[in-house]
């Protein structure tokens, strides 16, 4: 399952105001620039462990940017397992499902989010098919590569998983 082999970054803005959305992107840039420890990870487990070991550092990086921009928002960084709908990031489509993620919430965390994949390093570098193949099996690579016919299949997965979730 693709959801078991990737580790996501999920940043939620305080609100949907332009200022809060701009702040979210500044926090994103600072976190991605400072968190070079993800580029050395050789497995999804290593990436999750790197995030957990550096939560305080990640929080402080975000907090510094927020203060620098003149805001007094609280910020939290934590590793979570959450449901995500089908998403597209550059040349990769991730099917709906439960994923582990480094989640950074700015203030109320009520604004639109920004996300990417920390492992394999899709948001840290220009990820190629060869990069993905090093960590995902052939079927998983084919599944997540953008192409015709995937939207319907992913929608079916979303519907199935939402029904399953409601029955539990």
Name these PLM-found stretches.
Residues 150-168:
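Short flanking/linker segments adjacent to small metal-binding domains or redox-active Cys/His motifs
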Residues 45-86:
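Amphipathic, coiled-coil-like alpha-helical scaffolding segments used for oligomerization/assembly
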Residues 5-55:
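Early exported N-terminus immediately downstream of N-terminal targeting peptides
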Residues 6-12, 74-78, 101-105, 115-117, ...:
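Soluble periplasmic/extracytoplasmic beta-strand elements of cell-envelope proteins
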Residues 92-150:
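Soluble extracytoplasmic domains of inner/organellar membrane proteins
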Residues 1-2:
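Membrane-interface motif at the C-terminal end of an N-terminal transmembrane signal
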Residues 18-20, 86, 113, 125:
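Intrinsically disordered, low-complexity acidic/polar segments
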Residues 12-16, 80-82, 107-109, 119-122:
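Solvent-exposed coil/turn segments that connect beta secondary-structure elements
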